[in-house]
UniProtKB/Swiss-Prot annotation:
This is Large ribosomal subunit protein uL30. GO terms for cellular component: cytosolic large ribosomal subunit. Disulfide bonds: none annotated. Gene3D superfamilies: Ribosomal protein L30, ferredoxin-like fold domain. Belongs to the universal ribosomal protein uL30 family. The gene is rpmD. Part of the 50S ribosomal subunit. It comes from the Bacteria. It holds the Pfam family Ribosomal_L30. The lineage of its organism: Bacteria, Bacillati, Bacillota, Clostridia, Eubacteriales. Keywords: Ribonucleoprotein, Ribosomal protein. GO terms for molecular function: structural constituent of ribosome. GO terms for biological process: translation.
Length: 59
């Protein structure tokens, strides 16, 4: 299965709590932090929910 590199590029300050929880669940803690995750439907759903805050690329 493919892997995705997910980077938080925008701050969570002033964002709704649901978006903050989603970003934390992805494992991102601060701006410019990155994680590598498997490309699953569950991860894609979380990415779509906060896509405006993230940069996603193939790992």
């Amino acid at each position: 299965m493919a892997k995705l590199k997910i980077t938080l590029v925008k701050s969570l300050i002033g964002r709704p709590e649901s978006q903050r929880v989603t970003v934390r669940t992805l494992g991102l803690t601060r701006t410019n932090s990155s994680v590598i995750k498997e490309d699953t439907p569950q991860i894609r759903g979380m990415i779509n929910k906060v896509a405006h805050l993230l940069k996603v690329e193939e790992a």
